[in-house]
């Protein structure tokens, strides 16, 4: 039993040692994840620390870097809300984003805007305003924008999603944000196995898919702020 515990401790230590620091994560920073259900990840709505970050990519990133670099005293917060469009996000932006005063803000929004036919013009204008307001509050704010994506086996990506991906890329360039492009990541992964291995309902990642998302997020953010 003691040998097994010692082995597990060694494996955990090796896993943490393999984590590379992200330059964008400076000591005492608050990292805020915003978005819809993919970000929400069934997060807790109370102070219970067991579930406060949810069970998705935000949790993976926070756990890896919170445990890997405790001396940095990073604060990871998740305010994703299942079902949100950018119009819903606008209604709670002051309370759930600006009031939290993040140092790094990551946003993933758009798939519900597509399914609910939010006009592209409204999607872009509202998203742009939210980012402008966040930057006005903190000129040094680091922004990460994650493009919406879907997986429809054997079908092309819907035009509405493609259009929103282009808008997110445009806004990332305008606001000096790191851009996390997921469509190709999941398309490439799906080419190696069944779609539902990564995304179980064309929209929501499985735990494996969340790991893919977290890995790509970290890769892009690490590269953007070297």
Residue ranges and their predicted role:
Residues 6-15:
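Bacterial N-terminal signal peptides
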Residues 22-27, 55, 59-75, 84, ...:
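Alpha-helical cap/lid subdomain in secreted, periplasmic
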Residues 35, 80, 147:
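Active-site beta-alpha turn of Rossmann-fold NAD(P)-dependent dehydrogenases/reductases
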């Amino acid at each position: 039993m003691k040998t097994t515990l010692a082995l597990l401790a060694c494996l955990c230590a090796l896993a943490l040692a393999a984590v590379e620091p992200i330059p964008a994560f400076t000591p005492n920073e608050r990292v805020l994840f915003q978005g819809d259900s993919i970000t929400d990840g069934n997060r807790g709505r109370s102070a219970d620390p067991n579930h406060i970050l949810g069970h998705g990519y935000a949790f993976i990133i926070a756990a890896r870097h919170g445990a890997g670099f405790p001396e940095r005293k990073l604060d990871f917060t998740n305010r994703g809300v299942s079902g949100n469009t950018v119009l819903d996000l606008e209604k709670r932006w002051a309370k759930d984003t600006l009031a939290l005063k993040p140092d790094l803000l990551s946003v993933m929004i758009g798939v519900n805007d597509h399914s609910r036919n939010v006009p592209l013009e409204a999607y872009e204008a509202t998203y742009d305003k939210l980012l402008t307001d966040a930057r006005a509050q903190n000129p040094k704010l680091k922004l990460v924008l994650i493009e919406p994506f879907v997986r429809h086996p054997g079908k092309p990506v819907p035009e509405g999603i493609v259009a929103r991906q282009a808008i997110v890329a445009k806004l990332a360039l305008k606001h000096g944000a790191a851009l996390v492009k997921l469509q190709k990541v999941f398309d490439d992964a799906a080419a190696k196995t069944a779609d539902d291995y990564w995304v179980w309902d064309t929209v929501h990642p499985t735990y494996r898919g969340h790991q893919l998302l977290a890995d790509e997020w970290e890769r892009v953010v690490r590269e953007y702020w070297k």
